Swiss-Prot record:
Its EC number is 2.7.4.22. The lineage of its organism: Bacteria, Bacillati, Bacillota, Bacilli, Lactobacillales. Keywords: Allosteric enzyme, ATP-binding, Cytoplasm, Kinase, Nucleotide-binding, Pyrimidine biosynthesis, Transferase. This is Uridylate kinase. GO terms for cellular component: cytoplasm. NCBIfam families: pyrH_bact. It catalyses: UMP + ATP = UDP + ADP. Homohexamer. ATP binds at residues 12-15, 55, 59, 163, 169, 172. Disulfide bonds: none annotated. Pathway: Pyrimidine metabolism; CTP biosynthesis via de novo pathway; UDP from UMP (UMPK route): step 1/1.
Length: 245
């Protein structure tokens, strides 16, 4: 077997990825299909963490715009991410993959609290760790959660597994047929160009901690494994990448 490019990764999934064609809620067959892809990678000895958004169940910003207190709206979203994490953990366990959910808010009846040292021990024992409930504070996105946790666990890369999006373009390819896809970008170029891969806080965290971002289409079977083993899939963002004009 080829040597993997990344030995410890954090996979960032949107909540909508769990909703399937419905677009909202949780579609269990879809979750099970994603879990199977992740399990195949775990079987290769790769250490895996997951962060899953909650947009399939709740979105804090629109709720706040409709009049709800923003802090309460964001805490509600954190509960949504935990629901997604528990469903994904169960799907992985059904495949025989030892998995732990760690939450930034104490929910000891259903998950472990987030403790960095414990997470690292789980990786050493071959377990997948799913980080839920954001960073435990309002106003921070799950993108920022992914970047922060990736830095804390010394992840080699953040895999931005997108639902039907195959990389980063200089314009919206759905609106502009001449849009150009980048194979490689630097973190600095992403920030300068205002490319909306992840939010600004997460982008800066990734740059400062020298963490690669790989944006790719998760709907293509086997893509997660291809990225980890170094195939040129999607767009790679790093501090060392050469910008494709």
């Amino acid at each position: 077997m080829a040597e993997p490019k990344y030995k410890r990764v954090l996979i960032k999934l949107s909540g909508e990825a769990l909703a399937g064609e419905k677009g909202v809620g949780i579609d269990l067959p879809t979750v099970q299909a994603i879990a199977k892809e992740i399990a195949e990678v775990a079987d290769s000895g790769i250490q895996i963490a997951l962060v899953i958004g909650g947009g399939n169940l709740w979105r804090g910003e629109p709720a706040a715009e409709a009049g709800m207190d923003r802090v309460q709206a964001d805490y509600t979203g954190m509960l949504g991410t935990t629901m997604n994490a528990l469903v994904m953990a169960d799907s992985l366990k059904q495949l025989g993959v030892d998995t732990r959910v760690q939450t930034a808010i104490d929910m000891k009846s259903v998950a472990e609290p987030y403790i960095r040292g414990r997470a690292l021990r789980h990786f050493e024992k071959g377990r997948i760790v799913i980080f839920a409930a954001g960073i435990g504070s309002p106003y921070f996105s799950t993108d920022t959660t992914a970047a922060l946790r990736a830095a804390e666990i010394e992840s080699d890369a953040i895999l931005m597994a997108k639902n039907g999006v195959d990389g980063v373009y200089n314009d919206d390819p759905r609106k502009n047929a001449d849009a150009v896809k980048f194979d490689k970008l630097t973190h600095v170029e992403v920030i300068k160009r205002g490319l909306k891969i992840i939010d600004a806080t997460a982008s800066t965290l990734s740059m400062d901690n020298d963490i690669d971002l790989v944006v790719f289409n998760m709907n293509e079977p086997g893509n997660i494994k291809r990225v980890i083993f170094g195939e040129q899939i999607g767009t790679t963002v790093s501090n060392k990448a050469e910008l494709r004009k």
